[in-house]
Amino acid sequence: MSDRQAALDMALKQIEKQFGKGSIMKLGEQAERKVSTVSSGSLALDVALGVGGYPRGRIIEIYGPESSGKTTVSLHAIAEVQRQGGQAAFIDAEHAMDPVYAQKLGVNIDELLLSQPDTGEQGLEIAEALVRSGAVDIIVIDSVAALVPKAEIEGDMGDSHVGLQARLMSQALRKLSGAINKSKTIAIFINQIREKVGVMFGNPETTPGGRALKFYSTVRLEVRRAEQLKQGNDIVGNKTKVKVVKNKVAPPFRVAEVDIMYGEGISREGEILDMASELDIVQKSGAWYSYNEERLGQGRENSKQFLKENTDLREEIAFFIREHHGISEDSGAEGMEDPNLLD
């Protein structure tokens, strides 16, 4: 046995010398290690994700119908990474990035790396180069459906290109997944929804780009509008449901309900008020909301406005919500500058 053990030790040393420390290890060595995360920018979504945010070094897919809030959810994640001193990149394949809206959500547009590629191959190669640099903490690709293969762009309008985009995504993800894990980059792929023709039973909806992204994603989020939010006769936003359809780091199928206000993004006050009411941190009596016997306001909108004006009180309530769910603030802030600190 000792000869076999010595041979194994020598082989392990050779592997580590050739491929670097940590390239092979015993499974139990990392059993105690927590998943390093970065907040999604939404407290309700952090709780639904189960680990306090998006796991670093993993692939996330965010999909849903048009104008459901997919890009808004992604921009909040970028703003959170930048707030913690990290570097962010946005691959705008749809050529629809609105810098004014991004700025309102808290994104530092002077520091955000932006690329608007001509072809799908170009967009994915740029993403790979940024990930392999090890200096980017989050990269958002908007969207998979807009990553059109070069052959399709150069071909005629009626030409058939069956499975071309699926093959492109499959090859790209095979190359990207290892680099994403090593660099601790959060890679968010935004995707659209398509209808499968002739489906009689089950869900006819599917996402473009083949099956590869479904397999490689650690987390898949489905974003859908639930109802409109009105102030008088004016529509001021949407109540949006974000369902965690797949989760490899915590139990899946949890749902986060958030208010996405037009021109403002996710309402922090709205989600804090709803979650605190559920946990009885904030008491609701009739139409009145109160906290520690102090009245916040009559009706939800007035209470939201009160919390918006009193940020110290808002963050105090948020602290108790985090404490209840066992989530620490800025859980991924440490090591944001240097991914090697997490190795």
Swiss-Prot record:
UniProt cross-references to Pfam families, sorted A to Z: RecA (PF00154), RecA_C (PF21096)
Keywords of this entry: ATP-binding, Cytoplasm, DNA damage, DNA recombination, DNA repair, DNA-binding, Nucleotide-binding, SOS response
One GO-annotated biological process of the protein: DNA recombination
InterPro entries per UniProt: AAA+_ATPase, DNA_recomb/repair_RecA, DNA_recomb/repair_RecA_CS, P-loop_NTPase, RecA-like_C, RecA-like_N, RecA_ATP-bd, RecA_C_sf
GO molecular function terms listed in the Swiss-Prot or TrEMBL record: ATP binding; ATP hydrolysis activity; ATP-dependent DNA damage sensor activity; damaged DNA binding; single-stranded DNA binding
Residue positions binding ATP: 64-71
Domain of life according to the entry: Bacteria
UniProt-listed SUPFAM superfamilies: P-loop containing nucleoside triphosphate hydrolases (SSF52540), RecA protein, C-terminal domain (SSF54752)
Record's signal peptide: none
Main location: cytoplasm
Subcellular location: Cytoplasm
CC terms in the record's Gene Ontology section: cytosol
Family under the similarity heading: Belongs to the RecA family.
NCBIfam families: tigrfam_recA
Function: Can catalyze the hydrolysis of ATP in the presence of single-stranded DNA, the ATP-dependent uptake of single-stranded DNA by duplex DNA, and the ATP-dependent hybridization of homologous single-stranded DNAs. It interacts with LexA causing its activation and leading to its autocatalytic cleavage.
PANTHER family linked to this entry: MITOCHONDRIAL DNA REPAIR PROTEIN RECA HOMOLOG-RELATED, RECA
Protein name, entry field: Protein RecA
Taxonomic source organism: Bacillus anthracis
